[in-house]
Amino acid sequence: MTLTETPICNFGEKAKNFDLLSTENKKVSLKDIEGENGTLIMFICNHCPYVKAIIKDIVKDAKYLANLGIKATAIMSNDVKNYPEDSFENMISFSKLHNFNFPYLIDSTQQVAKEYAAVCTPDFFGYNKNLELQYRGRIYAARPTELGAAMKLIATTGKGPEKQIPSMGCSIKWLE
C-alpha cells in the first residue's frame, strides 16, 4: 500500500463529463450529478484502509451537503483484476453496507480517473455551481470536517478556501 497525497487544487478547472455505470445498474453522467450549488466527486474504493476509516463520515458529509444543494458521487477506478475486493459486485455490497446516499460508479477503463488526474483513494474534487474546481483537499484532521466546510463555502460564495491540506490515501491501482 503506497501512501499518496493529492496535488494542490487547480482552481477553476472545469469538471469533465463521464458516462459510468452505477451500483444501481444505471448509467450516470456529470449532468445527472450536478448540484444546484455545487458538486462533489470522490474517487474511492472498497479495499483501501484510508477509505474504510472514513466511509461513515463520507456518507454523513454527503447527506449534509445535499441539504446545501450540493450533490455527491463516488467513482471507483481501481484495477479489479488485481484487487478483487474492488469488483463491481463488491461495490454493490459496500454501498449497501454503508448506506450510500449518492451514486457509486465504476470506471473500469480508468479513463475518468485519468481525465480528472485522480491519484489516490480517497481523492475529493469539490466544484461550485459552474462546475469549476474549488476544493481538492482532505476530509478532515479533526472536527468539523474540512471537506464539509469547504463545500459549504463553495455553495454560498462560489469559491473554495485558499488554504487546503491534501487528502492522503492509497494510490489508484492502475491497469497494466
Which residues are covered by each model-predicted region?
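Chalcogenol-based redox active-site neighborhoods
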Residues: 1-164, 174-176
